[in-house]
Every structure is written in C-alpha cells, then in structure tokens.
C-alpha cells in the first residue's frame, strides 16, 4: 500500500497500458488476417499470370526484328573487344 493514495493512479496507468497493448495485438491480428486473405487470392492470380506468361513467351515480339545474326558484318568490329590487348590504347579496357 502506498502513502498518499497514489495506488489508484498506478492501477489506472497499468490498466491503460494493458488496454493499449491489447489494442495493438488486435490490430496486428487484423493485419495478419488481411494478409492471409490476400494470399488466398494470390493463388488465382498466380495461375492466371502463369498462363499469360506461357502465351506471351510463345509469340515473337512484333517490335523486334527477327534475325539469326548481325544485320551487317562490318558493324561487329565496333562491339568486339580488341584482338591484342597490349596494343590497345583504350582507357576503359
């Protein structure tokens, strides 16, 4: 027992602290329930996405040209590395 009647104030603070913790736990439980609901929907979306990916990958991209090699052989020299690195004067190599 505390002198001066301070025991009631301590009980009130303890009660509010417990209520705040309980409210926080309820919010976390609600958040986890919403997450579980979203995960249940994800299976349906995942199957639809897989089907879309198979369809998209089976068709060629209409914006990209279909080539089996370089369009111009002389352009290859610009994209190849140097044949002899000792004689190369490039700063980035």
Curated annotation (Swiss-Prot):
Membrane topology listed for this record: Lipid-anchor; GPI-anchor
Positions of the propeptide segment: 91-93
First-listed, main subcellular location of the protein, grouped into a coarse class: membrane
Subcellular location: Cell membrane
Residue ranges constituting the G protein gamma domain according to the UniProt record: 20-93
Parts forming coiled coils: 12-52
PTM-bearing positions, type Cysteine methyl ester: 90
GO biological process: G protein-coupled receptor signaling pathway
Entry GO CC: plasma membrane; side of membrane
Lipid anchor positions (S-farnesyl cysteine): 90
Lipid sites, type S-palmitoyl cysteine: 88
InterPro entries for this protein: G-protein_gamma-like_dom, GG1/2
Keywords: Cell membrane, Coiled coil, Glycoprotein, GPI-anchor, Lipoprotein, Membrane, Methylation, Palmitate, Prenylation, Transducer
A Pfam family reported for this protein in Swiss-Prot or TrEMBL: G-gamma
Subunit (UniProt): G proteins are composed of 3 units, alpha, beta and gamma. Interacts with the beta subunit RGB1.
PANTHER family to which the protein is assigned, alphabetical: GUANINE NUCLEOTIDE-BINDING PROTEIN SUBUNIT GAMMA 1
Protein function: Guanine nucleotide-binding proteins (G proteins) are involved as modulators or transducers in various transmembrane signaling systems.
Protein name, as recorded: Guanine nucleotide-binding protein subunit gamma 1
Gene: RGG1
């Amino acid at each position: 027992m505390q002198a001066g009647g301070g025991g009631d104030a301590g009980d009130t603070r303890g009660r509010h602290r417990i209520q705040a913790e309980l409210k926080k736990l309820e919010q976390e439980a609600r958040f986890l329930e919403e997450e579980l609901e979203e995960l249940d929907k994800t299976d349906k979306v995942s199957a639809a996405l897989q089907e879309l990916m198979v369809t998209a990958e089976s068709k060629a991209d209409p914006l990209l040209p279909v080539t089996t090699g370089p369009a111009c052989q002389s352009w290859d020299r610009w994209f190849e590395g140097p044949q002899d690195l000792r004689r190369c004067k490039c700063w980035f190599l």
